[in-house]
């Protein structure tokens, strides 16, 4: 048996996983991601050894309401935000629904990008030269309801993990809120861990 064939068999049996363009890795116990690093959903899916894909439900430049102005630290004159809704898939199975809001003044014409093909963070970093620095997250258990049942292909009242997050980055030399999102993960597909020390 060749080394290549042995690796192929271990991948097929679930002991190893491949990340395109990066290499082959040992799969840990369970499907889990850590909450310390700032990663995109695409990166989370890749880390678990799955092939990520995205479906854009809608993308619009809209008027910012009071809540979004507050969380994104926008002034009264900053009326426009970019709204983006997507479903993320792991090996063609829906695992996450995300609704994202960004201050349009920092990212003009961002609505022109095809977010079914490219990661939002990649666009922010490579096209708008943003350095993502930190994020604050709240985590809540919710029950699947309304459109989430269809988006994630789950039964009503199935538990989901909901994240509300504000992401910060350096824009024009200043650290500012660059993104607010709310997302829901299927709990049968994702686990998260937090490393703590004392």
Predicted regions and their residues:
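Short, cationic-aromatic polyanion-contact patches
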Residues: 25-38
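C-terminal all-alpha effector/ligand-binding and dimerization domain
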Residues: 51-198
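N-terminal helix-turn-helix
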Residues: 1-26
């Amino acid at each position: 048996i060749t080394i290549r064939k042995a690796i192929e068999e271990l991948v097929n049996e679930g002991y190893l996983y491949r990340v395109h363009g990066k290499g082959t890795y040992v799969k840990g116990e369970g499907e889990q991601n850590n909450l310390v690093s700032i990663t995109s959903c695409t990166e989370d899916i890749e880390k678990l050894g799955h092939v990520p894909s995205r479906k854009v439900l809608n993308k619009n430049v809209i008027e910012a309401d009071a809540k979004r102005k507050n969380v994104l630290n926008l002034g009264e004159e900053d009326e426009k935000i970019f709204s983006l809704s997507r479903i993320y898939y792991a090996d063609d199975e829906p695992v996450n629904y995300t609704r994202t809001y960004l201050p349009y003044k920092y990212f003009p014409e961002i609505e022109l990008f095809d977010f079914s093909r490219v990661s939002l963070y990649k666009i922010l970093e490579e096209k708008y030269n943003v350095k993502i620095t930190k994020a604050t997250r709240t985590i809540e258990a919710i029950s699947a309801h309304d459109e989430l049942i269809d988006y994630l292909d789950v039964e009503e009242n199935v538990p989901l993990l909901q994240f509300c997050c504000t992401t910060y980055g350096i824009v024009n030399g200043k650290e500012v809120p660059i993104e607010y999102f709310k997302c829901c993960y299927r709990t049968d597909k994702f686990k998260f861990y937090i490393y703590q020390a004392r």
